[in-house]
Amino acid sequence: MSKSTNRTETRTATLKAPAAVAFEIVTDLRHWPQFFPDGVYAEEDGDIVRWWALEGDGVRHWSSRRTLDRSGLTVTYDQVDCAAPLTASSIQWRFRPAADGTCEAELTLRADSQNSNAGREAVAAHLAAADELIARVGQIAENWDQLKELVVHFEDPLFIAGSTDAVYGFLYDADKWPERVPHVTALTMTEDQPGVQFFDMDTVTPEGRAHTTRSVRICLPHKIIYKQIGLPKLLDAHTGHWHFQTTPEGVTVTARHTATIRPDALNLLGADTTVADARRYLRRVLSTNSLQTLRHAQAFAEEPAHA
């Protein structure tokens, strides 16, 4: 009797997009949380990529070894820490350019497991994503030029003459923000996995607009990453982080935002609102709110009791 279950699924599709664009989408890790609904965060360390993704009511974390062939427009991600019953899994993308500016995308998913009911179910679950995944990459690639216009990305740094621990603690303890940050009117938070937070937050913009959002956060030692999973009506996606850089005098905290505008929701800002108008609005509102939060963190961390 075989002691393992091994399966491979391959899907191909013709994309009305250049091969180089499609290749960038699956290799530039910044795109994953922004354009893929389950993606929360990914970071690279040499050829190792660490991933965090929504799964059920929680977050799954794993690592893969990435093998890049840029000239061949091919990338392979081999998981290095498979949990039983899976014993191996991988995803490979290959893009073949065509003379008319389109390309053929080929996606190959492989999974091995223990030869058991649980193993076969795990393999089937891994391979079931093939159709959805190649369709999603095609949709993104074919609308890439428009998407670039709809994405607002910026960073706001602030120096704080206090300890990194105090600032990090202020931002980590988001459930205390309604007492500490005026534009946050209510917030409920859970942390069932260490360092993984889910919270529902009510905020008010400078114009008095009320928003309710739901977010997931990954709290790493040097960075707190977030992704909104319950979004305001104007946005298709909103991701970002708080990054901490300790200096001899204190800490520089950088608030990063990447937001994708919904073009069919522009009228929420007025009948004649353009994408450029919405970009300016988001840059102002998101920056104002995050800098307000940082300035309250600054006041907290620079108090003698916390400095």
Region locations from a protein language model:
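Hydrophobic ligand-binding cavity/cleft-lining segments
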Residues: 1-46, 131-193, 307
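Hydrophobic, helix-prone linear segments
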Residues: 1-74, 83-88, 288-307
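A short, structured loop/turn motif at beta-sheet edges
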Residues: 19, 44-47, 67-73, 94-104, ...
